From Swiss-Prot:
It comes from Pyrococcus horikoshii (strain ATCC 700860 / DSM 12428 / JCM 9974 / NBRC 100139 / OT-3). The lineage of its organism: Archaea, Methanobacteriati, Methanobacteriota, Thermococci, Thermococcales. Its EC number is 2.7.4.9. It catalyses: dTMP + ATP = dTDP + ADP. CDD domains: TMPK. It comes from the Archaea. PROSITE patterns: THYMIDYLATE_KINASE (PS01331). PANTHER family: THYMIDYLATE KINASE, UMP-CMP KINASE 2, MITOCHONDRIAL. ATP binds at residues 10-17. One of its GO terms (biological process) is dTDP biosynthetic process. GO terms for molecular function: ATP binding; dTMP kinase activity. This is Probable thymidylate kinase. One of its GO terms (cellular component) is cytoplasm.
Amino acid sequence: MRGYFIVLEGIDGSGKTTQAKLLAEWFEDKGYEVLLTKEPTDSELGKLIRRIILEESVIDGSKISYEAEALLFAADRAEHVKKIILPALSEGKVVICDRYFYSSLAYQWARGLDLNWLIQVNSFAPRPDLAILLDLPVKESLRRIKLRGTLTEFDKIVELQRKVRHNYLKLAEMFPEMRIVNALSSIEDIHSDIVALVKHELLGL
């Protein structure tokens, strides 16, 4: 029996990682085998992408182009899909992924890349059974990022986050598997909303 593939998406600070863990625990309590994963992955390629994002100068001393960045994300995703996601699904596991190709579309579209090109680059990636968009106002996102102590270049981040949030909401209109959850609620209420979605959309409960 094929498993379920669930993705959590949202702008920085929206609580994706926390909610992915809580959802994994919920499924495990119900007796399901669960694979909790993320993108970029922990592979060598995924680590390289994180270095590029953080340092922006690891290739030749200058920032790589957004096109090259998009292709690196897609390469990491291709490995992730073939070696981790599809095998787990074929074993009947529930795969919960913290970020997926929607992140590439939302962020790299915000940086000026062509959306249709980005969709084509990621066309190999199977669509999940359910993609949950944790929607959060940019002001609250920035407050949470500040609390983590990871906020730099404030003005640039504000503008990027605005564009990314707008893009995510557009993607929710384009992709029927995507559902929106209000990420301003408490952790517990958000989890309850996600569980309700899973029960309705996937489990028929």
